[in-house]
Amino acid sequence: MKVLIAYYSMYGHIHRMAEAVAEGAREVAGAEVLIRRVPETLPADVLEKMGAVETQKKMAQIPVCTIGELADADAIIFGTPTRFGNMCGQMRQFLDATGGLWMKGSLVGKLGSVFTSSATQHGGQESTILSFHITLLHQGMVVVGLPYAFQGQMRNDEIIGGSPYGASTIAGTQGERSPSENDLAAARYQGKHVASIAARLAR
């Protein structure tokens, strides 16, 4: 049973969340977990102006995802930063290249799940995940969120990410915040939750 985590991260927040998602998925017996990043679309000079070059270098060891890997997976957990309440352009361009999979019905019946980040507490995390779900549903995927069985969603003693739609984290306007332990716990729970359902469906 193969679980694919496909993400884009500019400053490392989604990368760290992806690692936590993978940790959770690997807790499920029989789960083969792959972490992949979607292709970068911004030129090097733009990344340099945005102060993202060093982080990109740190993630260089993560293989770039191919369209074929989506078809090979039993479950796909996507990670994207929020861009104006939607998925980032890099993820959008990657998914726009999946028309061939749609024509063949290659993703029909596979599990799909999403996690995200935003600069601010109300920066569009829920709209990003919900609008992402539209693409998954058009592909015939079965959408999985983050249930309230994860008790960390009920905390009000600190600023946290996460919703029933998926795990999330708040990066800060300058990227100064790292995912909190609660955010990472949510990501682990989501990874394990998706992998557990995939394992049951694979029997």
Swiss-Prot record:
<feature type="binding site">
    <location>
        <position position="138"/>
    </location>
    <ligand>
        <name>FMN</name>
    </ligand>
</feature>
<keyword id="KW-0285">Flavoprotein</keyword>
<dbReference type="InterPro" id="IPR037513">
    <property type="entry name" value="NQO"/>
</dbReference>
<dbReference type="InterPro" id="IPR008254">
    <property type="entry name" value="Flavodoxin/NO_synth"/>
</dbReference>
<feature type="binding site">
    <location>
        <position position="102"/>
    </location>
    <ligand>
        <name>substrate</name>
    </ligand>
</feature>
<dbReference type="GO" id="GO:0016020">
    <property type="term" value="C:membrane"/>
</dbReference>
<feature type="binding site">
    <location>
        <begin position="9"/>
        <end position="14"/>
    </location>
    <ligand>
        <name>FMN</name>
    </ligand>
</feature>
<dbReference type="InterPro" id="IPR005025">
    <property type="entry name" value="FMN_Rdtase-like_dom"/>
</dbReference>
<dbReference type="GO" id="GO:0050660">
    <property type="term" value="F:flavin adenine dinucleotide binding"/>
</dbReference>
<keyword id="KW-0560">Oxidoreductase</keyword>
<feature type="binding site">
    <location>
        <begin position="82"/>
        <end position="84"/>
    </location>
    <ligand>
        <name>FMN</name>
    </ligand>
</feature>
<comment type="similarity">
    <text>Belongs to the WrbA family.</text>
</comment>
<protein>
    <recommendedName>
        <fullName>NAD(P)H dehydrogenase (quinone)</fullName>
        <ecNumber>1.6.5.2</ecNumber>
    </recommendedName>
</protein>
<dbReference type="InterPro" id="IPR010089">
    <property type="entry name" value="Flavoprotein_WrbA-like"/>
</dbReference>
<dbReference type="GO" id="GO:0051287">
    <property type="term" value="F:NAD binding"/>
</dbReference>
<keyword id="KW-0547">Nucleotide-binding</keyword>
<dbReference type="InterPro" id="IPR029039">
    <property type="entry name" value="Flavoprotein-like_sf"/>
</dbReference>
<keyword id="KW-0520">NAD</keyword>
<keyword id="KW-0521">NADP</keyword>
<dbReference type="GO" id="GO:0050661">
    <property type="term" value="F:NADP binding"/>
</dbReference>
<dbReference type="GO" id="GO:0008753">
    <property type="term" value="F:NADPH dehydrogenase (quinone) activity"/>
</dbReference>
<keyword id="KW-0288">FMN</keyword>
<feature type="domain" description="Flavodoxin-like">
    <location>
        <begin position="3"/>
        <end position="194"/>
    </location>
</feature>
<feature type="binding site">
    <location>
        <position position="11"/>
    </location>
    <ligand>
        <name>NAD(+)</name>
    </ligand>
</feature>
<dbReference type="GO" id="GO:0010181">
    <property type="term" value="F:FMN binding"/>
</dbReference>
<dbReference type="Pfam" id="PF03358">
    <property type="entry name" value="FMN_red"/>
</dbReference>
<feature type="binding site">
    <location>
        <begin position="117"/>
        <end position="123"/>
    </location>
    <ligand>
        <name>FMN</name>
    </ligand>
</feature>
<dbReference type="GO" id="GO:0050136">
    <property type="term" value="F:NADH:ubiquinone reductase (non-electrogenic) activity"/>
</dbReference>
